[in-house]
């Protein structure tokens, strides 16, 4: 019996600035690293997806994933599910494994919000009178968070020793680092380059880009 491929929700139509940055890229990247095939359920970012989709993804966002009878939403949860199911992208040693899981949550809870608030002000409200001042006020906190990541990474190539779902999540945040604050830390600049040079990342991003159609709202 042939196993069904997992299906991930993704956008087929987004503004130009979002191309190559939408969060389904994280899941595509993990699946490419694992050598697992998948299908996409494409949606329109410009319009509400409707009640049927909201039962799958309560916040009407992407990604969500359906794998057989299992439905999951939130990119961190999907990454953890895939790593545990396929026994890949998580270290085997308990200490390293839990370090990877801790860094997965740290990326989502301690680093991403600091970068996202800058992106929101600079990209979505860039024409507002208050935008520049808000961005400058937010920068020190984001820089401090990134400095902590750099210090923890140190001379290691990856956060938990070997490449893991934590690195997929952390590195993907730098795609939306509109001020390129991570590049102020030489350790993170090199880390970012290592991550984005991986063939699986490049395949995942190419696949996401191939799914996009027009950028303009109908």
Predicted region positions:
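GST-like domain detector, emphasizing the conserved glutathione-binding G-site
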Residues: 1-133, 140
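GST-like fold's C-terminal all-alpha helical module
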Residues: 107-197
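Terminal-tail/helix-coil boundary detector
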Residues: 206-218
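A generic structural-conservation signal
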Residues: 40, 91, 162, 204-205
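Active-site-flanking alpha-helical
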Residues: 83, 173-174, 205
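Short, solvent-exposed turn/loop segments enriched in Gly/Ser/Thr/Pro and often Arg
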Residues: 44, 165, 208
């Amino acid at each position: 019996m042939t196993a069904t491929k997992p299906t991930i929700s993704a956008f087929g139509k987004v503004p130009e600035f979002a191309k190559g940055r939408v969060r389904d890229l994280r899941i595509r990247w993990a699946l490419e690293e694992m050598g697992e095939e998948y299908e996409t359920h494409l949606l329109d970012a410009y319009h509400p997806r409707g009640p049927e989709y909201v039962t799958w993804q309560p916040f009407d966002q992407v990604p969500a994933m359906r794998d057989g009878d299992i439905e999951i939403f939130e990119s961190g949860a999907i990454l953890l599910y895939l790593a545990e199911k396929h026994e890949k992208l998580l270290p085997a040693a308990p200490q390293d494994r839990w370090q990877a899981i801790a860094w997965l949550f740290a990326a989502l809870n301690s680093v991403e919000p600091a970068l996202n608030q800058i992106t929101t002000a600079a990209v979505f409200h860039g024409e507002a009178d208050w935008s520049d001042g808000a961005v400058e006020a937010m920068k020190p906190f984001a820089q401090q968070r990134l400095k902590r990541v750099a210090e923890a990474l140190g001379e290691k190539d990856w956060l938990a020793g070997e490449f893991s779902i934590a690195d997929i999540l952390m590195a993907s945040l730098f795609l939306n680092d509109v001020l390129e604050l991570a590049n102020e830390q030489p350790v993170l600049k090199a880390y970012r380059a290592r991550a984005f040079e991986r063939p699986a990342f490049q395949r995942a991003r190419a696949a996401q880009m191939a799914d996009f159609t027009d950028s303009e709202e109908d």
